[in-house]
């Protein structure tokens, strides 16, 4: 699950392009097939979103949940790719983006009636 937070006025019109950037970055950075993760957009009203004073209304928070196992360099590459692509494709400055990768052990994941450590048919590798 990926969650993206931002001001409704800025985030709502960009949802489709943001999803495309995130899916492409996950594919290029982690070799995850496009569309494999759910993305939830939380479009907040200005009075519901207090962000740092030195950020613009473009301020966007991206939280990415992953099964643990990827190398530090792989995760850093993904983060830097997202910063770059968001600025290049959507005009959102890196200064206005916050990205958090949250990892949990495979046994803490549940999907398709099994836990992540029981899945033997993933079409991507979590140990990259």
Swiss-Prot record:
This is Uncharacterized protein HI_1388.1. InterPro entries: Tauto_MSAD (IPR037479), Tautomerase/MIF_sf (IPR014347). It comes from the Bacteria. SUPFAM superfamilies: Tautomerase/MIF (SSF55331). It holds the Pfam family Tautomerase_2.
